Amino acid sequence: MNKNKRFAWKTQGVANKHNIISGNDWRFTVLTSRLIRMEFSNAGEFEDRATQIVFYRDFPDCTYKTQRQGTTLFIDTDHLHLSFDEAVGKESLQIHLKTLGVSWHYGQKLPPQLKGTTRTLDEADGSVKLEDGLCSRAGYTLMDDSGRLVLSEDGWFDRKKPEEDLYFFGYGHDYIACVQDFYRLTGAPSLL
């Protein structure tokens, strides 16, 4: 296939190795003290290419501590405490927000989110249903990047490796920092 020079984006999908903790079928990337990428793959294959949404995972070194007790992994940052039992799998995953004292468990329904934007106002006549946003009064949200296409080196879109790819945003009520780090991850939106 020919290289698509017209749509060759500058991306940095590969995360800083210092920020990665991994096992046979899982990988966690501590992007900031409040943003963690969580990947699960039965084949043990993980995706480092940029996706339709996530262009930049090359965040600087993040300060965190890891600890193991038997088969359970603990990751502590200034704001989050993650626990994961490798023997049980992703169903054991939970993240606790230290600042608000709330926890999220894998598979748990997310609390109501503050609304975001709509893609277009074309053909709108009156109110428009808004999509969920990144910010929540509960202090956390989850972005699922599993089904997105990846950007291949030749500038075309490609199918992603079969995996679950989640981003946990635990920013409490610091909505500005949440959106700033989202833009750091995705790139700033285009302006007209």
Question: Model regions: which residues?
Answer:
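A short linear-motif detector with a strong N-terminal bias
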Residues: 1, 6-9, 15-18, 53, ...
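A low-complexity, Ser/Thr/Gly/Pro-enriched, surface-exposed linker/loop concept
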Residues: 2, 6, 31-70
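N-terminal-proximal low-complexity accessory segments that begin disordered
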Residues: 8-37
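Residues that act as N-cap/strand-start positions at coil-to-secondary-structure junctions
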Residues: 12-15, 20-22, 60, 67-69, ...
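Low-complexity, intrinsically disordered regions enriched in charged/polar residues
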Residues: 15, 30, 40, 48-49, ...
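Residue-level marker of intrinsically disordered, low-complexity segments enriched
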Residues: 18-19, 52, 93, 100
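Short, well-ordered beta-strand segments enriched in hydrophobic/aromatic residues
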Residues: 28, 36-40, 75-82
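Catalytic and substrate-binding clefts that recognize carbohydrates or anionic sugar/phosphate headgroups
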Residues: 66-192
